[in-house]
Amino acid sequence: MNKYQTHLLEHSVVKILSGTGKKHIALVAGGMSAEREVSLISSVGVSKALIELGYKVTFIDMGADIAVKLQEINPDIVFNCLHGTYGEDGCLPGLLNIMRIPYTHSGVLSSALAFDKIHSRSCFLKNNINMADSIVVSKSDHINTDPMKRPYVIKPLKQGSSIGVEVIFEEDDFHFIDYDFPYGEDIIIEQYIQGQELQVALLNGKALGVLEIKLLKNRFYDYETKYNKGFAKHVCPAQLPANLYKKLLIESEKIYKTINCKGPVRAEFILEEQTNKLYVLEINTHPGMTPLSIVPEIAAYAGISFTNLIEEIIKMASFES
């Protein structure tokens, strides 16, 4: 961790002035979710880009007093750099709508839909967007056998960054009765699909490109693989037939429009090996901005520097009436 990251962690509010007279940006990050660390790492690059662009930047570590802090500093715009609960689930956008402060990223309903795997799935299926078979299992069900034929995926309903995601393969010594539901009373059990991991970056409704994830160490694209060098190889642009590449772009833009997203979004797909069928895994309305994050990498391929990416995100800041 560098000195700048340590500085952000040690101070709940850090004021960084660029001195050029541009708008005042409140950079809200950290927070109380399991994705706090990822959010803080993202905020380092974002804050540097904002300062480079000439903005006055105030860093706020999200807490229960967020409304008071925002009233005190009175920013022109909030850059929502949170991941997970309270920032990515629509809570912070709801507060900012009430306070009439323009903010980056998606609004209340879009954020809430994307964050909740049950409701996003229902919405996508109603709009003919293909997803893997799944069921919801509750702790109170007291299931003592595999709830689905192996291999299957265990997903918390409301977590990002693959936190809490497990893949149960045929050979695994795993007994479902021992699963302790660490991230809530309900989980999604989803059919595991073997195939190409494909990621699409979108900005303001336009798909920028497709990237393929090639796993080098772990069996699936988990938290460790996402945030550590040497665990995966990124191939950008993804090596796909032109018609399939175009289909991914079109499908991603359809998903973006379906839940009325705003700003940057990352859509995750799997291309099944045997059937060449495309499945949507999820949509992320708060994609990471870390050095290993996918949206900045695809944006760079599309000719958009990290600083320009942040500027475009700021340009779309608004609140909902």
Curated annotation (Swiss-Prot):
Q: Where in the cell is it found?
A: Cytoplasm
**Which keywords accompany this UniProt record?**
ATP-binding, Cell shape, Cell wall biogenesis/degradation, Cytoplasm, Ligase, Magnesium, Manganese, Metal-binding, Nucleotide-binding, Peptidoglycan synthesis
So which cofactors does this thing need?
Mg(2+); Mn(2+)
Q: Which residue intervals define the domain ATP-grasp in the entry?
A: 121-315
GO molecular function annotation: ATP binding; D-alanine-D-alanine ligase activity; metal ion binding
What GO CC annotations are associated with the protein?
cytoplasm
Query: Could you say which residues bind Mg(2+) 2 here?
Result: 282, 284
Give the cofactor note: Binds 2 magnesium or manganese ions per subunit.
Q: Under which pathway is this protein filed?
A: Cell wall biogenesis; peptidoglycan biosynthesis
For this protein, the record's PROSITE patterns field holds: ATP_GRASP, DALA_DALA_LIGASE_1, DALA_DALA_LIGASE_2
Record field: transmembrane? none
**What is the reaction catalyzed?**
2 D-alanine + ATP = D-alanyl-D-alanine + ADP + phosphate + H(+)
**Principal location class:** cytoplasm
Class of the enzyme per the UniProt entry, highest EC level: ligase
Positions with a binding annotation for ATP: 148-199
**InterPro entries membership:** ATP-grasp, ATP_grasp_subdomain_1, D-Ala_lig_Van_CS, D_ala_D_ala, Dala_Dala_lig_C, Dala_Dala_lig_N, PreATP-grasp_dom_sf
The cysteines covalently paired via disulfide bonds are none
Residues bound to Mg(2+) 1: 268, 282
Q: Which GO terms describe its biological process?
A: cell wall organization; peptidoglycan biosynthetic process; regulation of cell shape
EC number of the protein:
6.3.2.4
Q: Name one Pfam family in it.
A: Dala_Dala_lig_N
HAMAP family (alphabetical)? Dala_Dala_lig
**Record function comment:** Cell wall formation.
Per the record, the similarity remark reads: Belongs to the D-alanine--D-alanine ligase family.
This one is known as D-alanine--D-alanine ligase
Q: Which organism is it from?
A: Rickettsia typhi (strain ATCC VR-144 / Wilmington)
Lineage of the species this protein comes from:
Bacteria, Pseudomonadati, Pseudomonadota, Alphaproteobacteria, Rickettsiales
